[in-house]
Amino acid sequence: MDLQDQVQRRIDELAGTELGLQVAVYRQGELVVDAVAGDGVTPETLYFAASTGKGASATVANVLVDRGVLDYDRPIVEIWPEFGAHGKDTATLRHVLTHSVGLPALPPGTTRKTLSEQADRLAATEPWWEPGTKMTYHAETFGVLVGEIVRRATGRTISDVLREVLNPLGIEENVFFALPGNQRHRLAQLVEPEGAEETFAMLAGMFEQVVPRAMQPRAAVVNRPELLAIEDASSAILTARGIAKLYAALIGEVDGVRLVRPEAVPVITGPALVAQDELLGNPATLALGYSIGRLGSSADESPATIGWPGMGGSVAWADTRSGVTFALTRTLFDPSGSASAIEIGNLVAKALC
């Protein structure tokens, strides 16, 4: 049984509880798994994938660095002068990409409708620490900061630049930071599992210091297309095939397209920061905009793998050693973990990595 059949059989079994799944795998630029399960789910179904989308915003930034538009170590104030308030004049894109810039908290009261106003407020905010000296996961401010840096450098929104990056790959309708009105019909309606309220409440309390409750993802919120139409580069609305292909073009060549020069790949994907998360307490090994280590394993166990998981159970990763990229999306928006993403990811890694 080939890998396509193995994955298809397993997600068909999982669809009873997961409700819907997409899995896509690229190897050396070739699509080798493209599987879906669940009522109404097709490879073109769009999923709100939460922080899995950070891989797309990081990739936009890295492409712009490779093109000479941005620089990892040039002070942000050179393109965004107001950002230097409260001693942030030494902060760089590298600090933002490694979650060490010291601005993990959205201003209190932020909602999706006011998210576009937060870049100016973050620029005026005192950092939690001197940029680059500590880190904690910038769950929602990551996208605000990367998006504004991209806008200042290019004069365009990060959504516009993302579309430019995606166009040569033919996936410009497969990864979005803001859901266009003409794509609303493709959006999957996520479902929270029964009995999950306690877990959601626990996570809300854990993140409330940095993410106001109105910005914390719940199915009732992210199932509303009008709210997903608001640009948020900390998340994405995507297909598994789209984000897997984006990662494949980052680490190698797909359909004759490379997003960055080959010599840039180890710079982008190698360890850029090893630290203890100041807020969450976990050890973190980060590349330039990505977590190192396959979901379900540590950075030491899978040091050639970069990616991001998303709350609710989606994930996308790329293994630079084997040239394999993997993505999974699902309809069940489960806050308690990503067991299916780990299981199917391990199945793929065992076969190909």
What role is predicted for each listed range?
Residues 1-36, 44-48, 134, 151-159, ...:
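Catalytic loop of the DD-peptidase/beta-lactamase superfamily, centered on the K-T-G motif
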Residues 43, 48-52, 64-104, 108, ...:
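Active-site helix/loop module of the DD-peptidase/beta-lactamase fold
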Residues 57:
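Active/ligand-binding-proximal structured segments within catalytic/core domains
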Residues 89-92, 142, 239-242:
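An acidic site on a long C-lobe helix of protein kinase domains
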Residues 125-132:
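Cytochrome P450 catalytic-domain "roof"
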Residues 132-139:
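Cytochrome P450
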Residues 141-152:
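Hydrophobic mid-domain F-helix/FG-region of cytochrome P450s
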